[in-house]
């Protein structure tokens, strides 16, 4: 299980923590810690434990799996439209597309349509009465998803695996 841990700068990305039982920890997302004055004080990182020396494929699966989950979470709950939080689950994306497509095909005759935004504790309902407003919402939602995916792909492509490979080959 991945967990956020705090430690010293220069922490090893792969470490055998118990040679007798062949326990290894793999670490990633190393970030500096700052106090209230902005002074750096150690680092935080994610780590997971293996009961064997991990392979490079296992390291990549672990780190990329976390990155994919982070991207999915950003898509799911990070979009805000007109000050309202929009939940972009797969089901909601389908519903937004279906409503948009039908409105375009009927030149707006299928409107109005109401969507629930916000969250469980503070829902907000918005009525789309004009095709232009629905199109604006839908296009911005799709642009947000595409931007998050592009940013995620760039982060994964920029990942430097050489330190992991070096530590695994020691």
Give each language-model segment a name.
Residues 2-170:
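A preference for well-ordered globular domain cores
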């Amino acid at each position: 299980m991945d967990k956020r841990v705090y430690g010293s700068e220069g922490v090893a990305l792969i470490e055998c923590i118990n040679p007798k039982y062949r326990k290894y920890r793999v670490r990633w997302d190393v970030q500096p810690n700052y106090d209230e004055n902005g002074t750096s004080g150690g680092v935080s990182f994610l780590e997971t434990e293996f009961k064997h020396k991990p392979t490079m494929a296992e390291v990549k699966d672990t780190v990329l799996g976390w990155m994919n989950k982070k991207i999915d979470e950003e898509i799911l709950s990070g979009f805000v439209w007109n000050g309202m939080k929009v939940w972009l689950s797969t089901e909601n994306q389908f519903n937004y597309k279906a409503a948009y497509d039908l409105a375009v095909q009927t030149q707006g005759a299928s409107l109005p349509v109401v969507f629930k935004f916000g969250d469980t504790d503070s829902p907000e309902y918005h009525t789309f009465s004009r095709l232009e407003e629905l199109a604006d919402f839908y296009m911005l939602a799709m642009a947000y998803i595409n931007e998050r995916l592009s940013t995620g792909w760039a982060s994964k492509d920029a990942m430097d695996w050489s330190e992991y490979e070096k530590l695994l080959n020691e």
